[in-house]
């Protein structure tokens, strides 16, 4: 007989998990492995709430493996380190992001692109290197191989810094890879949510001119006066869209809803790049004419490897970049998920795990 989540490993842990596609989260007792020779045990202080968490607890993508304990934007304190651990010591403040394992021997891993490893393990809703299920950061603690633990910079706040472990690297990695970092160039950010608002801040830190592209004019003042964008373009205004044709060098498309790509491609200059980060539930139509006639590129990107994620954290610390957050208690998570589904958050929920998670 298979062991239950609570008896599978020797160390009892408490968290909140979803049992089925209703997505309702409730108190959940499970267990974690002993701290191994290469492991770091992390007492979780804060955990960001990512849109992926919402998709996963509701099985929107069809691969949820219940019960699910979500959470991959984790900041905490190292409480145990294995004898082979050289990067961390007890008491260090650390982060754990989207991935917690990879094969370490494939071409992607050799290039510090563990996030593209065919055997990559997600921090939750996946099978770990020991053959048992991974549970995420909506919990007391987590045990992770040191290679997938990040040093959290001293001047980066634990709460508002937590979302950088997913949202931050998701926008930083494509900007670096696709060469979207040349000061003075014009970056469009399509969608002003959890990813988009961080993209604005990182773009400005690279010295880019940043325009937020949105269907909602109500976000204009906040985008410019609060987040620091240079301009705001409303996609429902035909005159302004026409005037903006051919003005942008790059566009980061963070929109997760089904939307038209043709208008965005029209905003790009010759040789412009449109990089998609959102994951709409249905395929998008990709028109060929603007690509061919303007020698334009459409690409994608998925988080980043460990080396680049550490680089991103250090960059954000240097430039005082954090996420705009709403701090919540653990027992407020279901309400937060309902609001997240309606895009009713500015711009990321973060759970105060250490001060609000307690067994019933």
Curated annotation (Swiss-Prot):
SUPFAM superfamilies to which the protein is assigned, alphabetical: GroES-like (SSF50129), NAD(P)-binding Rossmann-fold domains (SSF51735)
Residues at which Zn(2+) 2 binds: 103, 106, 109, 117
Family: Belongs to the zinc-containing alcohol dehydrogenase family.
InterPro entries per UniProt: ADH-like_C, ADH-like_N, ADH_Zn_CS, CAD-like, GroES-like_sf, NAD(P)-bd_dom_sf, PKS_ER
Tissue distribution of the protein: Expressed in the vasculature of the primary root and elongation regions. Expressed in the hypocotyl, cotyledon veins, vasculature of the first rosette leaves, and hydathodes. In stems, expressed in the vascular cambium, interfascicular cambium, developing xylem, and phloem. Expressed in the entire floral organs at late developing stage, and in the abscission, style and stigmatic regions of siliques and seed funicules.
Molecular-function GO terms, alphabetical: cinnamyl-alcohol dehydrogenase activity; zinc ion binding
Keywords annotated in UniProt: Lignin biosynthesis, Metal-binding, NADP, Oxidoreductase, Zinc
Name of the gene encoding the protein in the UniProt record: CAD9
Cellular component annotations (GO), alphabetically ordered: apoplast; cytosol; plasma membrane
The protein's annotated pathway: Aromatic compound metabolism; phenylpropanoid biosynthesis
Known function: Involved in lignin biosynthesis. May catalyze the final step specific for the production of lignin monomers, like coniferyl alcohol, sinapyl alcohol and 4-coumaryl alcohol.
Keyword Oxidoreductase carried by entry: yes
Pfam families, sorted: ADH_N, ADH_zinc_N
Cofactor binding mode and count: Binds 2 Zn(2+) ions per subunit.
Annotated protein name in UniProt: Probable cinnamyl alcohol dehydrogenase 9
SMART domains: PKS_ER
């Amino acid at each position: 007989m298979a062991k239950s989540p609570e008896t599978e490993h020797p160390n009892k842990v408490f968290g909140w998990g979803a049992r089925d596609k209703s997505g309702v989260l409730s108190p959940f007792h499970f267990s974690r492995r002993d701290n191994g020779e290469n492991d770091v045990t992390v007492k979780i202080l804060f955990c960001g709430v990512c849109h992926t968490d919402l998709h996963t607890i509701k099985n929107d993508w069809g691969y949820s493996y219940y019960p699910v304990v979500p959470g991959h934007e984790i900041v905490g304190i190292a409480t145990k380190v294995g004898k082979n651990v050289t990067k961390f010591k007890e008491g260090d403040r650390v982060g754990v992001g989207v991935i917690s394992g990879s094969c370490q021997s494939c071409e992607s891993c050799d290039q510090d692109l563990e996030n593209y490893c065919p055997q990559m393990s997600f921090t939750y809703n996946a099978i770990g290197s020991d053959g048992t299920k991974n549970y995420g950061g909506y919990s007391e603690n987590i045990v992770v191989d040191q290679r997938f633990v990040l040093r959290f910079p001293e001047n980066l706040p634990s709460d508002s810094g937590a979302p950088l472990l997913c949202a931050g690297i998701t926008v930083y990695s494509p900007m670096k890879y696709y060469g979207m970092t040349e000061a003075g160039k014009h970056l469009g950010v399509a969608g002003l949510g959890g990813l988009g608002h961080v993209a604005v801040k990182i773009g400005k830190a690279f010295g880019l001119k940043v325009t937020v592209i949105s269907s909602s004019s109500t976000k204009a003042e906040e985008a410019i006066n609060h987040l620091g964008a240079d301009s705001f373009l409303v996609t429902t205004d035909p005159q302004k869209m026409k005037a903006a044709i051919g003005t942008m060098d790059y566009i980061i498309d963070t929109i997760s809803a089904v939307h038209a790509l043709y208008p965005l491609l029209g905003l790009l200059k010759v040789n412009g790049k449109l990089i998609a980060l959102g994951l709409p539930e249905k395929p998008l139509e990709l028109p060929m004419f603007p690509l061919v006639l303007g020698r334009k590129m459409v690409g994608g990107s998925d988080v980043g490897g460990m080396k680049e994620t550490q680089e991103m954290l250090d960059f954000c610390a240097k430039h005082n970049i954090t996420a705009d957050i709403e701090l919540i208690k653990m027992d407020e998570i279901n309400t937060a998920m309902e609001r997240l589904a309606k895009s009713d958050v500015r711009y990321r929920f973060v759970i105060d795990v250490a001060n609000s998670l307690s067994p019933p």
